A protein has these predicted regions:
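Basic, flexible Lys/Arg- and Gly-enriched helix-loop patches that mediate nucleic-acid binding at interfaces
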Residues: 1-196
């Protein structure tokens, strides 16, 4: 789990700009890690890095219903009517259909937005649809994973076994579904598989 800072690309490599993998030590960069989804360059918050394609696919699939919660500061404050519209699902001006989302108004120009999909600039576009453009955006959680205050921007940590178990449960994966790599380790949690 990485606390992505603003100003860093959610990419594995870029010849001109810093990427999220540049924040990791060299030994971790060699493991074939990729970000699960994307956060815009100016967005910060929880970003999961893994080398397991099946896990990534399930986490990002709207069919898995994995909630992603964002804290946003906006120009102006959305209304309860805006929250009701987002709860029904909306179609943006360009025809992009967005699944129902939960909008909680936390105060003047402050909201929590819960999405179950991750389309291009979706959080920003949905809040702009409400007439309240985003001035700051941070992902707080993804499924059962929560970004704690102990992880500062640019820092990372390995998931605990409990977090791994909850994440697998959330997307319907079990250890038997893990892909084996050359070291006979589960790509999701790097522990030897039972009875290889």
């Amino acid at each position: 789990m990485l606390h992505k800072p603003a100003g860093v690309l959610t990419a594995t490599e870029d010849s001109r700009q810093r990427t999220v993998l540049d924040l990791l030590p060299p030994e971790l960069r060699k493991r074939g890690l990729s970000p699960v989804g994307r956060l815009d360059k100016d967005t910060e918050g929880l970003l999961l890095l893994t080398n397991d394609g099946a896990l990534t696919h399930r986490l990002l699939s709207p069919k898995s219903h994995v909630d992603k919660v964002y804290y946003a500061r906006t120009e102006g404050t959305p209304t309860e009517a805006d929250a009701a519209r987002l709860a029904q699902g909306i179609t943006l001006a360009d025809g992009l259909r967005c699944l129902p989302a939960e909008l909680k108004i936390c105060g003047q120009g402050q909201v929590l937005l819960t999405l179950r999909e991750g389309k291009f600039h979706q959080a920003k576009r949905m809040l702009a649809f409400c007439g309240t453009p985003v001035v700051y955006l941070k992902r707080l959680s993804m499924g059962p994973l929560r970004l704690g205050e102990d992880l500062r921007p640019g820092e990372f940590r390995h998931l605990t076994q409990e977090e791994i178990d909850k994440l697998q449960q959330a997307v319907g994966l079990v250890a038997a579904d893990c892909q084996k790599n050359d070291n006979n380790f589960c790509k999701i949690h790097k522990k030897p598989l039972a009875n290889p």
